[in-house]
Amino acid sequence: TRAVGYRDNSVAQMARRGRLDRVSHGVYRIPFMPGGQLGPYMEAALWPVGVRGVLSHETALDLWEVSDVNPAKIHITVPCAHRTQRKAPTSYVVHREDLDAGEISEIEGVPVATLERAIRDCAADGVGLDLIEQAVRNGRGRGLLTAEQAAALTSGFGLDRVATQRA
């Protein structure tokens, strides 16, 4: 808050006066501004205090709109070293992994794992092969994956025929 010219207690005062809505610890929004469809996802990315979470796994597949995956919870990846005293909301699944900068993208300002990374994470977590195949095929068809990426993703799952197809 100091970096933008506010005193430490200014945000709390604005929240008490109704000028800001407190979403969670350290996360506020302007009440008269629409949160948008991605609002809950940005809240999840901001939940881990001190670092920015990255939406990952099934949540990332859902945001990339490449498969019919329908995650029951929001998956967030934080660095391995990140620790917090706060318990994660029950609507979140927190994964600990040190992602490289090249494995992180953004969708409308929301940090999200790249499609390639999301597919790898989902496959490792046991997401159905039909959803993995659909994600690779649609990702390739939309230009979100190169032929090489698609081939590498599918070779270990017996889905080699998908890598060469462009939907």
Q: Language-model features: where?
A:
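Short gly/ser-rich loop at a beta-strand->alpha-helix junction or flexible surface loop bordering the NTP-binding
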Residues: 2-167
